[in-house]
């Protein structure tokens, strides 16, 4: 790769669900001899991975958090400032194409690309198009989705939409090579509980009580790994210590792909990235969609796996310690069912998404 190689700008919100697919595409484009840079917000600076600080451009941005006139005016001002900064970035870097991965931090660079005449496209990993991508969809040349049928009911957009899957970073592809081995009847049952990049308090509220309600014979089998917010750590640990559960508690896992592969059952939120990774690696799950979302994207995401009999979807209002204990007990008693769920999850996964998306980027850029 030389300094004269075409440059592709990757725009993503500053959370793992947006950054990880961007990273996976970046790896593939670099393999093909292209240069890449990331345009994002300040949150991305704390993530390690492909994008070092000298490969990241931070532009002003704001998420629509309120419909009040003052909040909307502030958001519009910041997005306008960000678009101007991104336009200057386009003039300086002269990218061959810009691709957005969702989140409001992608709005300024994608609008700037349109103003600068730079070919652009978006990728959406959700079963429902996100709000930022929905806004941008009319302004880009191409749309890539992880799942089929996302825009089938929108003739104006479906004609420029291609289903490619969710690009997987190298660590996920490595984990996907680990076959699923169902737990033996009296052997260890490895349970992983995660709640997204920030952790989910509901897991700390519900899971310890569910473990306490299991038959004592199952306590000795459990090997539990749980993501717990620091402020919840003491109360969660106290329950597991009292029950003598073999438990590892951490506020964040830097090696989550390997941990997904090492466990028999995963309890998690159903963000697009999590659902795609569970499918790619092929692991059974109990999914608890984040409530309150305007477009109910996590509910739809979880449905992709629950409809395939690869996961159990529980809405948060039904996610009680009693319900969870019942589900864990039933699955622990049916290792054959766990194996079938793992197989169904793997069948729903797609491991070549980064290659397919790279092909679309190159085609859109006319390279």
UniProtKB/Swiss-Prot annotation:
InterPro entries, A to Z = GlcNAc_MurG, Glyco_trans_28_C, GlycoTrans_28_N
GO molecular function terms listed in the Swiss-Prot or TrEMBL record: UDP-N-acetyl-D-glucosamine:N-acetylmuramoyl-L-alanyl-D-glutamyl-meso-2,6-diaminopimelyl-D-alanyl-D-alanine-diphosphoundecaprenol 4-beta-N-acetylglucosaminlytransferase activity; undecaprenyldiphospho-muramoylpentapeptide beta-N-acetylglucosaminyltransferase activity
The question of whether Transferase is a record keyword is answered with: yes
Name the predominant localization.
membrane
Entry keyword rRNA-binding = no
Q: Which GO terms describe its biological process?
A: carbohydrate metabolic process; cell division; cell wall organization; lipid glycosylation; peptidoglycan biosynthetic process; regulation of cell shape
Q: How does it sit in the membrane?
A: Peripheral membrane protein
Enzyme Commission number, as recorded: 2.4.1.227
Which UniProt keyword terms apply here? Cell cycle, Cell division, Cell inner membrane, Cell membrane, Cell shape, Cell wall biogenesis/degradation, Glycosyltransferase, Membrane, Peptidoglycan synthesis, Transferase
List the subcellular locations.
Answer: Cell inner membrane
Residues of the signal peptide: none
Q: What pathway does this protein act in?
A: Cell wall biogenesis; peptidoglycan biosynthesis
Q: Specify the enzyme's EC class, one word.
A: transferase
- Positions bound to UDP-N-acetyl-alpha-D-glucosamine: 15-17, 126, 169, 197, 298
Q: Which reaction does it catalyse?
A: di-trans,octa-cis-undecaprenyl diphospho-N-acetyl-alpha-D-muramoyl-L-alanyl-D-glutamyl-meso-2,6-diaminopimeloyl-D-alanyl-D-alanine + UDP-N-acetyl-alpha-D-glucosamine = di-trans,octa-cis-undecaprenyl diphospho-[N-acetyl-alpha-D-glucosaminyl-(1->4)]-N-acetyl-alpha-D-muramoyl-L-alanyl-D-glutamyl-meso-2,6-diaminopimeloyl-D-alanyl-D-alanine + UDP + H(+)
Q: Which GO terms describe its cellular component?
A: plasma membrane
Q: What does this protein do?
A: Cell wall formation. Catalyzes the transfer of a GlcNAc subunit on undecaprenyl-pyrophosphoryl-MurNAc-pentapeptide (lipid intermediate I) to form undecaprenyl-pyrophosphoryl-MurNAc-(pentapeptide)GlcNAc (lipid intermediate II).
What family does the entry list?
Belongs to the glycosyltransferase 28 family. MurG subfamily.
> Any idea what this protein is called?
UDP-N-acetylglucosamine--N-acetylmuramyl-(pentapeptide) pyrophosphoryl-undecaprenol N-acetylglucosamine transferase
Q: Which organism is it from?
A: Bradyrhizobium sp. (strain BTAi1 / ATCC BAA-1182)
């Amino acid at each position: 790769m030389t300094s004269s190689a075409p440059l592709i700008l990757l725009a993503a919100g500053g959370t793992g669900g947006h950054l990880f697919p961007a990273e996976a595409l970046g790896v593939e484009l670099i393999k093909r001899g292209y240069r890449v840079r990331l345009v994002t917000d300040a949150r991305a600076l704390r993530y390690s991975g492909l994008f070092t600080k000298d490969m990241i451009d931070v532009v002003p941005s704001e998420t629509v958090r309120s419909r009040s006139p003052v909040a909307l005016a502030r958001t519009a001002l910041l997005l306008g400032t960000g678009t101007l900064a991104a336009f200057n970035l386009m003039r300086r870097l002269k990218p061959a194409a810009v691709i957005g991965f969702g989140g409001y931090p992608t709005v300024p660079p994608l609008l700037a690309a349109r103003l600068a005449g730079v070919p652009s496209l978006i990728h959406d990993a959700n079963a429902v198009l996100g709000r930022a991508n929905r806004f941008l969809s009319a302004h880009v040349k191409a749309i890539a989705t992880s799942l089929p049928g996302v825009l089938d009911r929108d003739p104006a957009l479906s004609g420029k939409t291609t289903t490619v899957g969710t690009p997987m970073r190298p660590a996920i592809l490595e984990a996907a090579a680990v076959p699923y081995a169902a737990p033996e009847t009296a052997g260890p049952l490895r349970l992983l509980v995660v709640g997204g990049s920030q952790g989910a308090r509901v897991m700390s509220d519900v899971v310890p009580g569910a473990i306490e309600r299991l038959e004592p014979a199952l306590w000795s089998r459990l090997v539990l790994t749980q993501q717990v917010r620091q402020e919840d750590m003491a109360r969660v640990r106290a329950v597991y210590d009292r029950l003598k559960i073999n438990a590892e508690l951490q506020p964040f896992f830097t090696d989550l792909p390997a941990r997904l592969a090492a466990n028999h059952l995963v309890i998690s939120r159903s963000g697009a990235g999590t659902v795609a990774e569970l499918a790619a690696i092929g692991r059974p799950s109990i999914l608890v969609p984040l409530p309150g979302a305007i477009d109910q994207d996590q509910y739809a995401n979880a449905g992709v796996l629950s409809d395939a009999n690869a996961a159990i979807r529980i809405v948060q209002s039904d996610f009680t310690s009693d319900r969870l204990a019942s589900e864990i007990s039933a699955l622990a008693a049916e290792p054959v069912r766990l194996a079938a769920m793992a197989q169904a999850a793997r069948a729903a996964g797609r491991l070549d998404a980064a290659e397919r998306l790279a092909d679309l980027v190159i085609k859109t850029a006319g390279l």
